[in-house]
Swiss-Prot record:
PROSITE patterns linked: HSP90 (PS00298)
Region feature A, mapped onto this chain: 1-348
Pfam families, alphabetized: HATPase_c_3 (PF13589), HSP90 (PF00183)
Keywords: ATP-binding, Chaperone, Cytoplasm, Nucleotide-binding, Stress response
CDD domains noted in UniProt: HATPase_Hsp90-like
Species, as recorded: Geotalea uraniireducens (strain Rf4) (Geobacter uraniireducens)
Protein role: Molecular chaperone. Has ATPase activity.
Region C: start-end pairs: 566-645
Gene: htpG
Highest taxon in the source lineage: Bacteria
Protein name: Chaperone protein HtpG
Compartment annotation: Cytoplasm
Molecular-function GO terms, alphabetical: ATP binding; ATP hydrolysis activity; ATP-dependent protein folding chaperone; unfolded protein binding
Any GO CC annotation of this UniProt entry: cytoplasm
Matches recorded under SUPFAM superfamilies: ATPase domain of HSP90 chaperone/DNA topoisomerase II/histidine kinase, HSP90 C-terminal domain, Ribosomal protein S5 domain 2-like
Length: 645
């Protein structure tokens, strides 16, 4: 293709503006990002070569070369990795090809980017860090296996870039940074050495650089010639140790080394919450270095979130997102697993079914959950910080991972009617403080704590002093389908089915009271049933309500209002179901309705009041009324009549 000029996507330009114009305190990260990208590119070509050796073109001298040129004022980062063709260059550099782009930009707005330059790498766009130190970037690349697929990309970060075909003898990518005048320190040998040592020492490929030294002149016999002066000699030196950190003994690794490796593989520059480093022996031999992050990634709940840890076989890279190694509810884990038992040519498809992978997964999950249980027991404050980030994801395991259900049910936490906002309790703690008269574990699901606190379904529980768990995560509706009991106590939703809260004596007294209410209000009760027969399954007097006039209750195994909302939000078909309308026989409204009914059973206002009762019950649970205009008209009329009295 001939040379053409194209515009960056809006989001890319916003990102470039952020990079170019923000005063970052640590500009060294640009080199870390580019070396990390080069390492990934070599990983990819090695993986592809397992099924197609021809793409290597005989070049297996894996390395990342740094070429500082003080005369030209440029620093080049060269790799012999997978390379890119024109289409891939435009997809990977001209655009941000991820559905999380908007979320990324929002995240930048929400954080103090002056103190968080590492955000760039966290979102997989580390290449743009080049513009922190360069006023022009030139990229020349050729896709492995296609000698005619070389292209040249160039930009000054001004909103556009040029791209054209070019010649390149070998596969891989050269990125040349034309350094700003005030950034020429990055051409200094010792500055480069210090950055590589600090950030990229563990990269498994040699990071090399030509180094020139003055050496004494030597004769043909190799002996130094006295008085012969010195000559310049240039040699290629390796700047990093390349020792895989996970193969080293824990006692040899500093906390700083663990943290730097975490940054390398995760692009998350906060410290990890926990580091799990161990070797497994027996039926399955492997080494694992697993990190539990401190904060959830912005795209954790997006479909294209990259999950899984890096898989190696005998230190040979296989894949960077092996989903088969961990269940979905642990998708936020980062790290490396290096197996001695898998074949080097294992395919991604085989990974899903391989018995060794399943053994590794079982081992990893057990180790991770044990670490979380230990943290919860020994440092509950730390665990709470973790749980506020990852609790909703961890809960998924209760529903899907039956083998580890017992461990997981000890890890999940909830707010409750007896905790302050932001404080949580475990099921174990809940059971320990249950009154002797309480036989079941009570909970209520909803969108938020504030909505649940005002629910009429809680009135009787407050009166009796029974604690109710607040379940405000959408996943909770699925959790309680699997977690039906705990420690011999059944979990019971306060807005479903019948409640058994009373002692035998209290029950007898309440039944007598309800029978009396039925006699007093049977006529109006039947009338309400008839008026609402198309909307509710039944109308009955309530044992839940002490202050409110009415509420809606689902059957024991029926859909409640919260579950219906969640299914609708997911564009799922919601099965048609009717709930029970419960009325409070002690509420003044029942007396008013009964009085009107006894005076004039044909009074047209009675039907309106029945509709208002139903609408009121919907509103108190946070559901919309079916006819808002009719509802507001009736309320306005009632207000006028009340004012006229």
């Amino acid at each position: 293709m001939t040379k053409s000029t194209k515009k960056f996507e809006t989001e890319v330009q916003q990102l470039l503006d952020l990079v170019i114009h923000s005063l970052y305190s640590n500009k060294d990260i640009f080199l870390r990002e580019l070396v990390s990208n080069a390492s990934d590119a070599i990983d990819k070509v090695k993986f592809e070569s397992h099924s197609n050796m021809d793409i290597l073109e005989g070049n297996t001298d894996w390395k990342i070369k740094l070429i500082p040129d003080k005369t030209a004022g440029t620093l080049t980062i060269r790799d012999n990795g997978i390379g890119m063709n024109v289409v891939e260059v435009e997809e990977n550099i001209g655009t941000i090809a991820r559905s999380g782009t908007r979320a990324f930009m929002e995240n930048l707005k929400d954080k103090n980017v002056q103190n968080n330059p590492e955000l760039i790498g966290q979102f997989g766009v580390g290449f743009y860090a080049s513009f922190m130190v360069a006023d022009k970037v030139t990229l020349i690349t050729r896709k492995a296996g296609d000698k005619n697929a070389a292209c040249r990309w160039e930009s000054t970060g001004d909103g556009s870039y040029t791209i054209e075909d070019c010649e390149k003898e070998t596969r891989g990518t050269d990125i040349t940074l034309h350094l700003k005048d005030e950034m020429k320190e990055y051409l200094d040998e010792w500055k480069i050495r210090s950055i590589i040592k600090k950030y990229s020492d563990y990269v498994q490929y040699p990071v090399v650089m030509d180094v020139t030294r003055d050496e004494p002149a030597k004769g043909v016999d190799g002996e130094v010639i006295e008085g012969g002066g010195t000559i310049e000699k240039t040699t290629e030196e390796t700047l990093n140790s390349m020792k895989a950190i996970w193969t080293r003994a824990k006692s040899e690794i500093s906390e700083e080394e663990y943290e730097e490796f975490y940054k390398h593989i995760s692009h998350d520059y906060d410290k990890p919450f926990r580091t799990i480093h161990y070797s497994a022996e027996g039926t399955s031999e492997f080494k694992a270095l697993i990190y539990i992050p401190s904060h959830k990634p912005f795209d954790l709940f997006m479909r294209d979130h990259k999950k899984g840890v890096h898989l190696y076989v005998k230190r040979v890279f296989i894949t960077d997102n092996c989903e088969a190694l961990l269940p979905d509810y642990l998708r936020f884990m980062k790290g490396v697993v290096d197996s001695s038992d898998l074949p080097l040519n294992v395919s991604r498809e085989i990974l899903q079914e391989d018995i060794q992978i399943k053994r590794i997964e079982k081992n990893l999950v057990g180790k991770i959950l044990s670490t979380l249980v230990e943290t919860k027991e020994k440092t509950p404050e730390d665990y709470l910080k973790f749980y506020k980030e990852f609790g909703p994801v961890l809960k998924e395991g209760v529903h899907f991972d039956h083998a580890n259900k017992e461990k997981l049910q000890e890890l999940i936490l909830f707010e409750s009617s007896k905790t302050e906002a932001g404080n949580y309790i475990s099921l174990k703690e809940y059971v320990a403080r249950m009154p002797e008269a309480q036989k079941e574990i009570y909970y209520i699901t909803g969108a938020s704590r504030s909505a649940l606190e005002n629910s009429p379904h809680l009135e009787i529980f407050r009166k009796k002093g029974f604690e109710v768990l607040y379940m405000t995560d959408p996943v909770d509706e699925w959790v309680v389908q699997s977690l039906t009991d705990y420690d011999g106590k059944k979990l019971h939703a306060v807005d479903r089915g019948d409640l058994e809260l009373d002692s035998a004596e209290e029950k007898k007294e309440k039944e007598a009271k309800q029978e009396e209410a039925k006699k007093q209000y049977q006529g109006v009760l039947d009338f309400v049933k008839e008026q609402l027969k198309d909307k509710v399954k039944e109308v009955r007097f309530s044992s839940r309500l002490t202050d409110s006039a009415c509420c809606l209750v689902a059957d024991e195994y029926g859909l409640n209002a919260n579950m219906e909302k969640i299914l609708k939000a997911m564009n799922q078909d919601v099965p048609e179901s009717k709930r029970v309308l419960e009325l409070n026989p002690d509420h003044p409204l029942m007396q008013v309705l009964s009085s009107i009914f006894e005076k004039d059973k044909e009074n047209p206002r009675l039907a309106d009041y029945c509709g208002l009762l139903y609408d009121q019950a919907l509103l108190t649970e946070g559901s919309p009324v079916p006819d808002p205009l009719r509802f507001t008209r009736l309320v306005a009329e009632l207000m006028v009549k009340a004012a006229e009295k």
